[in-house]
């Protein structure tokens, strides 16, 4: 578990709301296996709480190193709602994962008090957010807000991030090298087409009339 929701529900408590759920797979797996696992979890949630969730579909934008999809549910006013789930497939995790209790913010409608999940350490989360700020494809104000808040109010020292950022950059290089090799193989397969008949352009042919 990582990202803004992890910050709010595990180490920090009263924090900004996050619109999505972010995870990292400890062992890479395919899209169908991940969504099936979420279906099993949401079935258990529905049995315990009566609140039904369902898989809505993949993100319209394809992602090379993550499984991104939407889960739907019915809100308190009977209106359909959905939230995004982003599951990173391969990630260089530098610090040890921490098993932390989920902070109860709504005593009546929240998780049981003994619920705990594996979460990224604060160092790991902030390092990822700093790296995200350098990515032109993913420049979000919330990442800057999180870094600023943790560095000021949270008493977090940015000098602690040199090592995890360096390790993550090395890990990212290996990951993207693997992705580029995968892309080259994919393009090679597309280029290895069998024999195809020649196409001849008939300029004077009349179009077929549809009935």
What are these regions (language model features)?
Residues 1-11:
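Short gly/ser-rich loop at a beta-strand->alpha-helix junction or flexible surface loop bordering the NTP-binding
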Residues 9-21, 25-211:
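Structured mid-to-C-terminal alpha-helical surface segments
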């Amino acid at each position: 578990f990582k990202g803004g929701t992890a910050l709010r529900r595990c180490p920090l408590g009263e924090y900004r709301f996050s619109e999505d759920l972010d995870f990292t797979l400890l062992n890479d797996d395919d899209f169908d296996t991940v969504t099936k696992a979420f279906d099993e979890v949401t079935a258990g949630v529905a049995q315990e709480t009566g609140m039904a969730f369902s898989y809505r579909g993949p993100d319209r934008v394809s992602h090379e190193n993550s499984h991104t999809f939407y889960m739907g549910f019915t809100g308190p006013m009977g209106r359909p709602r959905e939230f995004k789930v982003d599951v990173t497939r391969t990630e260089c995790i530098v610090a040890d994962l921490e098993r932390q209790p989920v902070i109860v913010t709504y005593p009546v409608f929240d998780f049981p008090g003994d619920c705990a999940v594996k979460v990224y350490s604060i160092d790991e989360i902030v390092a990822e957010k700093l790296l995200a700020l350098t990515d032109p494809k993913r420049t979000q104000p919330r990442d800057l807000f999180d870094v600023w808040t943790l560095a000021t109010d949270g008493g977090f020292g940015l000098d602690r991030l040199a090592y995890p950022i360096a390790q993550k950059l090395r890990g990212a290089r290996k990951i993207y090298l693997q992705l580029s090799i995968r892309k080259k193989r994919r393009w090679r397969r597309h280029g290895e087409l069998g024999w195809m008949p020649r196409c001849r352009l008939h300029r004077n042919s009349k179009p077929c009339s549809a009935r």
